Amino acid sequence: MNRIFLQFGSGLGPMSRSLPIALALAEARYEIKYLGYDMAKTHMKKAGIEELCSDFGISDIKKGSPNPQWSTADEFWSMIGYGNMPWVERKVDELISLLKEFSPDYILSDLGILACIASRIMGIPLIAINQSCYHPNVKLKWWEDNYKFENYKSEDSLLYKLNAYLKKKGAPQLNTFTEIFTGNLTIIPSFYDFDPIQDVKKYNTHYVGPVLYIPKETASERVLKLF
């Protein structure tokens, strides 16, 4: 039986995209374990998806100084607490220990940055559910003036800090911060015309539209042929 580890970010969006995929994989007899936020636990338990570890949490994360003028993903993720690298390194090391015990064949992440980092270090194939705004090849109009800073490598940038940690672990370096949210397969749950990306071939990126779960017994033959 193939095993999959799932981590998703906070808010309803990542969970609402991840849960249908987890349900379909469970139906296909994959063993799935997840890590998510407290608000998601009731829904995941109801769906029969087991936690990787009930004691693993990120409630002790300390947010950085708020900056309403942030203009890059690097700045935003630093601001919400991931710029604190001693904390990030500790949590990733904890996660790696748990993953060694579970031994997943794949990691599935919807903006679960700790899982993305662990995948890069452990060499476990990553299926990344991403938003176009966190894809390295997107260029949003209101970020255009500061877009070059996405590659900013000062010692204060999260890109620099992550690369220092990845180098220490013998893992591949990042070219941009948002590259951490791409995988062996990168899925955009949207439409190209609505969220265009400059080069979809890079990072093996695929637009799939809204992610929904249809029980196998009620799915049409046309839908089943997709799989």
Name every feature range the model reports, one short phrase each:
Residues 191, 208-217:
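Short beta-strand->alpha-helix junction loop in the catalytic core
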Residues 47-57, 124-126, 201-212:
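Active-site regions of enzymes building and remodeling cell-envelope glycoconjugates
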Residues 110-113, 191-192:
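Short, well-ordered beta-to-alpha junction loops that form the rim of enzyme active sites
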Residues 1-2, 202, 214-227:
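Nucleotide-sugar donor-binding and catalytic loop/hinge architecture
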Residues 1-108, 116-118, 133-136:
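Glycosyltransferase specificity loop/lid
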Residues 117-125:
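Alpha-helix C-terminal capping segments
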Residues 125-204:
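Active-site-proximal region of nucleotide-activated glycan assembly enzymes
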Residues 100, 178-181, 227:
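Solvent-exposed alpha-helices and their adjacent loops that cap or buttress functional pockets
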